[in-house]
Amino acid sequence: SWMNKIDLGENPSSQDLLDHLHTIHNRYTGFTEKIATSCCDLSGKNSYELLIDTVDPNSHTDILDLACGSGVLLEYCNKLFPFNFKLSGVDMNDNELKLARSRLSNQDIDFYNAKAQKLNFIKDASKDVIFCHWALTLMDPLVPVLKTIKRILKNQGIFSAIVDGDLHSATGYLEIHNIIYKFVQKIFPNYGLLELGDPRVRSLKTLDELVKKIFYDCEINITPHVLSFKQTPEVLAKEVSGFFYASLVLSSKHYEILVSELSDYFDKTSVDGFSEFNLPVNRLVVKKTSKICSLKK
C-alpha cells in the first residue's frame, strides 16, 4: 500500500496513491466540506464561491465538476444558476458520489464514477465550464488530466481550479502544517518526504509553467487568496486536523492526541476565546479563447 511504501522509504506508484485516496475517502467521506465552506476571504467568499465567480451565466450553460466529491460545489451551482443549466459531476470514489447523489437527489444532475484521466465518454468541445476544487493536487499522472480538460472544453470555455497556495502566505499556516507533520512523522518517520500527487501544482510558478505547456494560446490567470475561519480552539482543532490528509492516516487514539495539541496551539493564539485558521489557496483560471487553441491538439 501507499503507507507501507512510504514507511519503507520506497516510491509509491500511481495505483498506490489511488488506493490510498480511496481508503481515506471511504473512511472520511465528505471530510473537506466543513473547512472549505467555512474558510472565507475578506469579502466573505469561500473557495467554492471563488470558482463560481468565474462563470458567465449569459454565455455558459454546461458545467462539469471534476472530482466533485460529495457534491458541495454542484449544490451551489444548482441554487445559483437558472434551471436551463446542465450540471454534471465526475468522481472516482463511490462513497463520495453516494453523498453527492443524496444531496442533489431531486435534481437533473448526471454523476459519473470515473478517473479524471479517463473521460472518453465526454465529447470533444462539449463543456462551457470545468471546475476542479482541491483535487488537481492529488491527481497522478496530471498531464493527461489537463489534456482531457482541454479536449472537452468548448471554445470560449473556462477551466477553474482551487489548489494549495504558498505555505508562507497565510499567518500561522506553516506552524499548523508543521505541528501535524511532526506528529505524524513520530509514528510514520518517512511521511511527508513524498507529497501526494504532482508537486508542480503546489507552487504558483511551476503550476503556471505546466499549464502553459498544455494550454498554449489560452488566457491563464493564477491568483493567490487567503481564506480564514474563526472558531473556538477546540472546534477549530477538530476541523483543521481533518482537513490535512496527513492526520487521517493516524489511529483514532493518536488522532485525538494530535487534536489536543492543535487545540493548545489555537488556545495560545486566541483572542476573546476565538482563534483563527488562515488557509492559503491559488485559483487557476484558464480561458480557451483562440481558434488556434481549440484546433491544435
Locate each region found by the language model:
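Short glycine-centered segments of the SAM/dcSAM-binding site in methyltransferase folds
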Residues: D62, G157-I158
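Conserved catalytic/acceptor-binding region of the Class I
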Residues: V143, I158-L227
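Conserved Class I S-adenosyl-L-methionine
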Residues: W2, I6-E10, C40-S43, G197-L210, ...
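Conserved class I S-adenosyl-L-methionine
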Residues: W2-P57, V72-Y76, E96-L99
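A short SAM/SAH-binding and catalytic strip from SAM-dependent methyltransferases
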Residues: V129-L142
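A short glycine-rich, Lys/Arg-flanked "PGG" loop and its adjoining helix->strand segment in the class I
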Residues: V143-N155
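A short acidic, Gly/Pro-enriched loop at the edge of an enzyme's catalytic core
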Residues: F121-I130
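Class I SAM-dependent methyltransferase SAM/SAH-binding core
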Residues: L64-L66, S70-L119
